[in-house]
Every structure is written in C-alpha cells, then in structure tokens.
C-alpha cells in the first residue's frame, strides 16, 4: 500500500506541475524587448526660381519649403518585440506630417505608426498585423537616413507612405517574403466618407543573398465615395543591387491606372522610372546620383492648376552625405527638374525648369529599455 501511495502521489505532483511548467516554457511568456525610438530631421531648402510662396511644388510632400529652416519630420515612440507578438506606437510632427496627413482630422495627423501584431504559427513565420503601418509601396522611407537620397523621389512622393488596415506576412524561407493587406484606402487613416469599399494590396520580396533583392508590390482600390467610384490599379517594382561594399544601384518602375469616370472602360495611366546609384568613399562619406521620369499627363495622382491636368517631368539629383557616427547625418543635395510644359513657378510666371538645393541635419536613436 505504501508503494501505491508513493506512486500515486508522484503521478499527481507531475500532473499538477505540468500547467505551471508549460506556462514557464511557453514562448508567449518570454519577456519582450522594449525600445525607445526618436528621430529628428531639420532642413533648409532654396529654390532658384524663387516662387512667391514658401512651398515649392504641389506634388512634393517632404522638404517642400523655400528659403526657410524647418523640421521635415520628428518622431518619438515605443516598440515591443517578442517572439510571439510585437507592437509600435510613434507620434510625429513636422512639414512631412502636415503635408501628408492633410486629409486626416485632429490628432490623427500625429500618428506616425500605431500597430500591433501576433504570430499565427509555431515557426513564427506567419504574422498578422493591424493598425497604422508603413506602406509596402515604394523604395523610400519618410526617414531620410534610411534612403540613399536626401529628398524623396517622384515615385515615392506620389504613392502612399502609410496605410491603415490589416495585413498577413508569410516568410517561408530566408529568400522569400509574401504579404497581403486590406486597408482603408490610398494613404488614409480615416476612410473617405460614403466609401464602402476597402482597398487591397500584395507584396513579394525576393532576397537571394545580402547583395541583391527584388520587390514587387500592388494596390487595388478607390479613394472616392460610392456614387463617383473610380477604381485604381497600381504596380510598384524595384530592385536593389549592392555590387560591392562601396557601390550600389537601385532601379524602379511604377505603373498605375485609374478609371476616368465611374464604370468607365477608359483609364488614365501614369508611370514612373527611377534609378539611383550610390558610392561610399569611406564609412563616413558617400554620394548618390538619381535620375527619374514621371508621366501623369491625365492627372490620376497629381493635379496642376495651371494645366488643369497632371505632371510630366524628368529629374536629376546629386547628394553628398557625411555621417560622423551611424546615428547622425549631414547631407547636401542639388536637384534639377525639367518638364515639357511651363509648370514651375518663377516669380510671377512659369518656366520649364526647376533647380533647388537642400541641406539637412538628422539624428536617429534607438535605445533598448528591456
């Protein structure tokens, strides 16, 4: 009887301890990393044409000021990163926030990121995220330090920087990442009034090694009320090739179509070609050369009051970067745009060419608190 009692007691103790052990060993119970992030980018820009207003062009939404010092973007936020869940909340201000969030009401203008995500499987290669998050469209970030050029390319300025919705991210291997998203519209936090149709997008990233990557992203949706709904279809394709530790090349091609009217079979098409070459002279000094062409002559995503139509222009820029440490950047850029139309303000008239210079000072910090 004594042996039976001992065996029974040991069995009960083992069973009772299982939940506690399972809880202790569960990846959900692991302590997450908590990171405090901050960024500040100040700039001065001067337009040779000397426009009569302090904004340069209606199709720019970053660094779009003339002959003044200003803050393009400043944010502060917290992020949580754990094996099974993650989240980020960042609040921002600056001319970028003012221009890109012009359609958003009240305090929504101050949301840079606000999203949460959870892992959907044991391998943690299938994730669901929801909230306000960076757009999958484009090869540039609002944070200039993350980009090869100081100012934003025409392709990125006229496609979404952020989306609001939910997305599923699947990473079957180190080479491939697949994403699907449903969102409130083309760079929207709050949906357009009386629009009952959500928008959709996809992304495919192929990274065969550290030197090369290819990204193909799409968007399907509308940004208009139901009674005037015009469908939009957009494709964003680019590749990054880091040939050596010093020299890299980026090439991109965007094309989109929007219905000319509700239920119309006619579409207004726009496209953008972009190329950027970057050379790092040392760990602290680098330079980039950009060439681009933007054609939206029917005004699908741009509108020029003078033409009562859209933008057609080509452009070239060169920038020099000095980074004394990885968290600080001093940058200078010269940029030239030329259009077949006289669209660029010069004093009280319009010309075909636009030349402007931009300098910036940026600081970006990430501090782990846990």
Residue ranges and their predicted role:
Residues 31, 81-83, 121-123, 135, ...:
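Outer-membrane beta-barrel channels and translocator barrels
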Residues 27-56, 128, 212, 355:
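Transmembrane beta-strand segments of Gram-negative outer membrane beta-barrel proteins
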Residues 175-178, 195-196, 202-310, 314:
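Detector for outer-membrane/organellar transmembrane beta-barrel domains
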Residues 22, 47-68, 96-113, 121-205, ...:
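Surface-exposed coil loops of outer-membrane beta-barrel proteins
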């Amino acid at each position: 009887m004594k042996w039976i009692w001992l065996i029974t007691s040991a069995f009960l103790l083992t069973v009772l301890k299982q939940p506690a052990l399972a809880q202790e060993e569960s990846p959900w119970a692991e302590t997450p990393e908590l990171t405090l992030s901050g960024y500040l980018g100040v700039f001065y820009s001067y337009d040779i044409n000397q426009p009569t207003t302090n904004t340069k062009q209606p199709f720019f939404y970053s660094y779009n000021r003339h002959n003044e010092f200003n803050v393009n973007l400043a944010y502060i936020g917290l992020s949580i990163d754990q094996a099974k869940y993650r989240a980020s909340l960042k609040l921002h201000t600056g001319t970028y926030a003012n221009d890109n969030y012009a359609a958003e009401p009240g305090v929504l203008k101050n949301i840079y990121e606000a999203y949460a995500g959870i892992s959907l499987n044991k391998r943690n290669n299938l994730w669901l995220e929801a909230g306000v998050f960076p757009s999958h469209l484009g090869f540039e970030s609002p944070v200039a330090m993350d980009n090869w050029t100081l100012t934003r390319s025409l392709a990125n300025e006229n496609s979404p920087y952020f989306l609001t919705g939910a997305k599923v991210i699947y990473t079957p291997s180190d080479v491939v990442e697949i994403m699907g998203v449903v969102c409130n519209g083309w760079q929207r936090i709050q949906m357009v009034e009386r629009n009952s149709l959500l928008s959709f997008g996809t992304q495919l990233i192929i990274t065969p090694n550290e030197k090369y990557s290819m990204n193909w992203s799409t968007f399907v949706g509308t940004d208009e009320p139901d009674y005037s709904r015009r469908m939009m279809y957009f494709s964003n394709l680019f590749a990054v090739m880091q040939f050596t530790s010093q020299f890299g090349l980026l090439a991109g091609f965007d094309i989109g179509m929007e219905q000319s009217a509700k239920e119309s079979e006619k579409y207004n098409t726009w496209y953008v070609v972009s190329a950027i070459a970057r050379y790092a002279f040392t760990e602290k000094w680098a330079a980039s050369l950009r060439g681009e062409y933007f054609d939206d002559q029917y005004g699908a995503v741009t509108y020029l009051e003078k033409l009562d139509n859209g933008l057609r222009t080509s452009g070239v820029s060169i920038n020099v970067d000095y980074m004394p440490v990885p968290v600080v950047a001093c940058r200078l850029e010269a940029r030239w745009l030329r259009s077949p139309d006289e669209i660029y303000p010069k004093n009280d008239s319009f010309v075909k060419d636009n030349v402007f210079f931009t300098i910036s000072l940026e600081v970006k910090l990430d501090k782990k608190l846990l």
